[in-house]
Amino acid sequence: MAREKFDRSKPHVNVGTIGHIDHGKTTLTAAICTVLAKEGKSAATRYDEIDKAPEEKARGITINSAHVEYSSDKRHYAHVDCPGHADYIKNMITGAAQMDGAILVVSATDSVMPQTREHILLARQVGVPKMVVFLNKCDIASDEEVQELVAEEVRDLLTSYGFDGKNTPIIYGSALKALEGDPKWEAKIHDLIKAVDEWIPTPTREVDKPFLLAIEDTMTITGRGTVVTGRVERGELKVGQEVEIVGLKPIRKAVVTGIEMFKKELDSAMAGDNAGVLLRGVERKEVERGQVLAKPGSIKPHKKFKAEIYALKKEEGGRHTGFLNGYRPQFYFRTTDVTGSIALAENTEMVLPGDNASITVELIAPIACEKGSKFSIREGGRTVGAGTVTEVLE
């Protein structure tokens, strides 16, 4: 019998720095890399390398963000840092950089500021489960009473947004001093990583979640049935299993009689695969792009939901003017556009290009979605915004 291969891989966790401008997010990111590089657990990365974050596109939106990697004794981390406030908002709403947890940076000299609040609220809305606090600039604001007051304020704020403020770890440090190699402050970076290891939960791997495939195309194979193709978003599918076809039409069940990838027959397909799935007893006209194949009972179709959105600026290819209550664009979920109308929050009259807002959406046809589902807002095929479902209503 062949011996099982020794598995060296550590659990992979995605984190990111959040917090008010100039509170030290990028300096902390550089400090983590520099301190851990001394133990061979990261590549030393300079502040200016992180600060000139490259552009990337997610859901038709350009976002600047820097990605660094490091390891602790327990885990491997991918860490995202954004240069600008708008980049954070876009990043969280599009899910361009998925965050399993966050490191909230608060300057002990300033305490809680407007973007501190906004980032905590957004993290809550898009489902970041926990965060660790790094109270920065404690070398300057060295009065312990002042530090305690700031820590208390941060705990209260976290609690008010639904996080566990009472038990959230707070590390008192100085990112700049750690970056400069002062051993007293380097030790605080190790404390921070230990807190992240222990407080931020290991995410469920995509392959362990319930199966879901977004249908991109359909075809008939004479004598065998209907094949749907698309990317497996999560989970695993095996030949012989029953699936549900969800969205746009009433839910119907079907049995999988074959799976193909790159013209080869397979007995299973898993998260990340592009596969063709043969369905028994389903006619081609009964399935269409925009529906999903899913594990029975795991996802429901919805027409009405609440969402957090970002409206693109004119320079980003967005609208030139704001939109009002009742605006009817298309909502692009996974592989298809569905028209819907937007109801703004009570105290909002208009959403201007560059704004982020909480809205309620009512679609003309139900689509498979759940809390955390991402979508683009489009007008005539061009992206004018992006959003995350925060609550399904009906």
Swiss-Prot record:
SUPFAM superfamilies: EF-Tu/eEF-1alpha/eIF2-gamma C-terminal domain, P-loop containing nucleoside triphosphate hydrolases, Translation proteins
Localization in the cell: Cytoplasm
Reactions catalysed according to its record: GTP + H2O = GDP + phosphate + H(+)
PANTHER family assigned to the protein according to its UniProt record, in alphabetical order: ELONGATION FACTOR TU, MITOCHONDRIAL, ELONGATION FACTOR TU-RELATED
Role: GTP hydrolase that promotes the GTP-dependent binding of aminoacyl-tRNA to the A-site of ribosomes during protein biosynthesis.
Family: Belongs to the TRAFAC class translation factor GTPase superfamily. Classic translation factor GTPase family. EF-Tu/EF-1A subfamily.
Name this protein carries in UniProt: Elongation factor Tu
Annotated source species: Mycoplasma genitalium (strain ATCC 33530 / DSM 19775 / NCTC 10195 / G37) (Mycoplasmoides genitalium)
Lineage: Bacteria, Bacillati, Mycoplasmatota, Mycoplasmoidales, Mycoplasmoidaceae
